[in-house]
Amino acid sequence: MATYSSNDFRAGLKIMMDGEPYAVESSEFVKPGKGQAFARVKLRRLLTGSRVEKTFKSTDSAEGADVVDMNLTYLYNDGEFWHFMNNETFEQLAADAKAVGDNAKWLLDQAECIVTLWNGQPISVTPPNFVELEIVDTDPGLKGDTAGTGGKPATLSTGAVVKVPLFVQIGEVIKVDTRSGEYVSRVK
């Protein structure tokens, strides 16, 4: 794998540090008036998603991580693993609950997802930015009941709970932003 100098760190670069893959989120090169230049780098730990800030000397380097993002189609969940398929080679890949995490509530059959692989194993699953789901349970919206915040909780077909406007009813299909978990619009 390639070795990168701290001067080469850019957003999106994936490096190995302490035996784990990290993604560079931002890098600021600092050249003080006195002393050695350094890079102040914000990193995201790919295995857990936690953020770390680290300072690298200008002479430091890091090995590139063998991390690949693949567009795969979600097939099904067998109770233990979530199964995905590569549309070009038709190979199937199984991701465990640790890799899928909270994104399980946004996975629909045949949805195109981005699966991040490290050493051939899935470490994270990113669902599509927007999904269309049916409302299976919500309180009825009463006419003129706008004294509150103007929203009510609704349970969707995947089990996710989203705050929706008062006019939305059971059985309607809504569009949800998976990054924030917020209601976007009704689907006609």
Curated annotation (Swiss-Prot):
User: What is the protein's known function?
Assistant: Involved in peptide bond synthesis. Alleviates ribosome stalling that occurs when 3 or more consecutive Pro residues or the sequence PPG is present in a protein, possibly by augmenting the peptidyl transferase activity of the ribosome. Modification of Lys-34 is required for alleviation.
Q: How is it modified after translation?
A: May be beta-lysylated on the epsilon-amino group of Lys-34 by the combined action of EpmA and EpmB, and then hydroxylated on the C5 position of the same residue by EpmC (if this protein is present). Lysylation is critical for the stimulatory effect of EF-P on peptide-bond formation. The lysylation moiety may extend toward the peptidyltransferase center and stabilize the terminal 3-CCA end of the tRNA. Hydroxylation of the C5 position on Lys-34 may allow additional potential stabilizing hydrogen-bond interactions with the P-tRNA.
Q: Which gene encodes it?
A: efp
The record's similarity note reads: Belongs to the elongation factor P family.
Alphabetical list of Pfam families matching this protein? EFP, EFP_N, Elong-fact-P_C
- Please state what the protein is called: Elongation factor P
What InterPro entries does this protein map onto? Answer: Elong-fact-P_C, NA-bd_OB-fold, Rib_uL2_dom2, Transl_elong_fac_P/YeiP, Transl_elong_KOW-like, Transl_elong_P/YeiP_cen, Transl_elong_P/YeiP_CS, Transl_elongation_fac_P
GO terms for biological process, alphabetical: peptide biosynthetic process
Keywords from the UniProt entry: Cytoplasm, Elongation factor, Hydroxylation, Protein biosynthesis
Gene Ontology CC annotation, any one: cytosol
The compartments listed are:
Cytoplasm
